[in-house]
């Protein structure tokens, strides 16, 4: 039997596989928490623990990591009041060193570290 990584990549290439790979994506924070991850260790840990527990229980072939808590770009333009696409032109980059970017990288790295070697085929 192929490793999970081989199974997933063989299926993506269209090669014959012994079974269809199974994966998931799931959000582990509440709707209210989806934009409150910046500088919030509770939401950070909730996302890490949620991914780890789900993967241990379900044992999927691949996982789509969710950077829960970071779904609202930190811009004064981004709001429910945007009424036309032209308004979005004024959104400026926060830069790759911004804590909103850096903390997303940290949460994804922490989630990835919880996976066993066989599941390192995260897609």
Predicted regions and their residues:
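Surface-exposed, active-site-proximal loop segments in enzymatic domains
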Residues: 35-39, 76-93
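A gly/proline- and charged-residue-enriched helix-loop-helix capping module
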Residues: 83-114
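Conserved small/polar residues in nucleotide/adenosyl-binding loops
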Residues: 122
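Short, basic interhelical loop/turn and adjoining N-cap
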Residues: 119
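N-terminal basic, low-complexity leaders that serve as flexible interaction/assembly modules and, when applicable
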Residues: 1-75, 106-116
């Amino acid at each position: 039997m192929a490793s999970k990584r081989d199974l997933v990549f063989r299926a993506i290439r269209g090669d014959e596989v012994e079974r269809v790979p199974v994966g998931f994506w799931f959000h582990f924070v509440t709707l209210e928490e989806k934009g409150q991850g910046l500088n919030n260790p509770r939401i950070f840990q909730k996302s890490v623990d949620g991914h780890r527990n789900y993967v241990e229980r379900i044992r999927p072939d691949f996982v789509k990591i969710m950077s829960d808590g970071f779904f609202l770009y930190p811009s004064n333009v981004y709001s429910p009041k945007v009424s036309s696409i032209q308004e979005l032109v004024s959104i400026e980059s926060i830069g790759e060193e911004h804590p909103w970017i850096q903390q997303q990288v940290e949460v994804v790295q922490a989630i990835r570290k919880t996976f066993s070697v066989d599941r390192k085929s995260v897609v």
